[in-house]
Every structure is written in structure tokens, then in C-alpha cells.
A protein has these predicted regions:
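Short loop/turn positions at the edges of beta-strands in beta-sheet-rich folds
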Residues: 37, 50, 60-62, 69, ...
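Short beta-strand His + acidic residue motifs that chelate non-heme Fe in jelly-roll/DSBH
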Residues: 54-56, 75-76, 98, 104-110
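Double-stranded beta-helix
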Residues: 3, 9-12, 23, 82, ...
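A short, N-terminal "cap"/entry segment at the start of jelly-roll beta-barrel domains
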Residues: 1-42, 55, 88, 134-138
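Glycine- and acidic-residue-biased ligand/ion/polar-headgroup-sensing regions
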Residues: 61-80
């Protein structure tokens, strides 16, 4: 039975690809899945459960764009791991730019799943990445 959900787990990278980013993000139930990975850019989709978080991280050589497609969140960033002096609330449609070399974390502050689109330049995850849970990502 087809429920109408986007269930294909495929990285469409290296081919032209058109997608409604909000729609495919909302239909994603994996912690992280690479939706498109090129040579210089990557888009992943994430699903963060209520009260969950991405986890504090830094990417020394990768800029990021993070866009909330469903839910609400808080993003914290800073140059030092122990001093995240930038804090903003995010809701559907909001985007945050994370410069390379910046510590950051996104926490789900809503009651439902947080659906997020991540764009990395250059790509950060291996082509075809599928991580069903946060534990799979660690």
C-alpha cells in the first residue's frame, strides 16, 4: 500500500535534481539522510525527536545553511566550545548560516519532531549516508 510518503532512500547527487525541500524534509523520518551530494555541495535531511538535539559539533572546513521545515528549535553557536554566545529561536521557514570553524548545536524545543534541511559546502557526509538514529551517527 502506498501511503504517499517519500520513502526512497537515495542520494540523487551528481545528477540534476528538483525537489520541494520542505516536503521531502517533512516526509523524512531518519535522523540524517543525504538527499543530494555533489562535488562541492551537499543537502541532508534530518529528523530530530522532541527534546532531542543534533549535538554540539564543529566543522573546520565546511560552511552550513540550516533551515527549519517543521517544528521549532534553538540554535546556539560560538567560537569556543564552552562559550556559545549566539542563541536564537527558530521556527518553520527560518534559516541560519553557520560559518566553518563555529561550534554549534540545534535543539528541538517543540512537542513533535523537528524536520530540518542542512546544506553543506563542501560536502561533509559520505555520499549515500543514511543514519536511522542519532546513535547511528555517533
Amino acid at each position: 500500500m502506498n501511503c504517499g510518503c517519500h520513502t526512497e532512500q537515495r542520494d540523487f547527487g551528481l545528477h540534476p535534481y528538483v525537489a520541494n525541500m520542505e516536503q521531502i524534509a517533512v516526509q523524512n523520518y531518519h535522523f540524517r539522510i543525504a538527499a543530494w551530494t555533489g562535488d562541492y555541495l551537499q543537502m541532508t535531511l534530518m529528523c530530530i525527536p522532541a527534546c532531542g538535539e543534533i549535538g554540539l559539533e564543529i566543522h573546520e572546513d565546511t560552511d552550513q545553511l540550516i533551515r527549519v521545515e517543521q517544528g521549532c528549535a534553538v540554535v546556539k553557536m560560538g567560537k569556543c566550545k564552552d562559550n556559545l554566545d549566539f542563541c536564537r529561536s527558530l521556527r518553520r521557514g527560518d534559516a541560519v548560516f553557520v560559518p566553518a570553524g563555529t561550534w554549534h548545536n540545534v535543539s528541538n524545543t517543540g512537542r513533535g519532531a523537528l524536520k530540518v534541511t542542512y546544506v553543506y559546502a563542501p560536502p561533509h557526509h559520505p555520499r549515500g549516508t543514511v543514519q536511522h538514529t542519532k546513535a547511528d551517527a555517533e
